[in-house]
Amino acid sequence: MPRRRVAAKREILDDPKYGSQILAKFMNHVMESGKKAVAERIVYGALDTVKSRKNSDPLEIFEKALDAIAPLVEVKSRRVGGATYQVPVEVRPSRRNALAMRWLVDSARKRGEKSMALRLAGELLDASEGKGAAVKKREDVHRMAEANKAFSHYRF
């Protein structure tokens, strides 16, 4: 156990355009080298593209995409005797969102469209429909947890 006090969670301000705290957190995941204005331009550009393609609320599509990506279980390595087992554990809600955002940004960066805003929009639309690289990542993690269900009695 750590000897110091646990750091307090910082309060994140809502984003100015949509008034959503989860979108503000997502912008922080998109941001590189502290360039928040660039990250905002990318995210708002992606949401505008989503709005023009789907003619519906882009924030709803964003939240639907995050739900489709967020994992329910993951595996953690646990050493027992001389062997290391991959033990399936449930994911806490805050980590679920963080992983979903990270996977969404990573898979958007690997796409082939011209700008990051278009890549992100494409990945958001794919994820909201239950397909795309980020959803595949979630399914891989779930499959790994299912395969190692036999070791679930090694709790943390």
UniProtKB/Swiss-Prot annotation:
It holds the Pfam family Ribosomal_S7. Keywords: Ribonucleoprotein, Ribosomal protein, RNA-binding, rRNA-binding, tRNA-binding. One of its GO terms (molecular function) is structural constituent of ribosome. One of its GO terms (cellular component) is small ribosomal subunit. Part of the 30S ribosomal subunit. Contacts proteins S9 and S11. PANTHER family: RIBOSOMAL PROTEIN S7 (PTHR11205). One of the primary rRNA binding proteins, it binds directly to 16S rRNA where it nucleates assembly of the head domain of the 30S subunit. Is located at the subunit interface close to the decoding center, probably blocks exit of the E-site tRNA. This is Small ribosomal subunit protein uS7. It comes from Azotobacter vinelandii (strain DJ / ATCC BAA-1303).
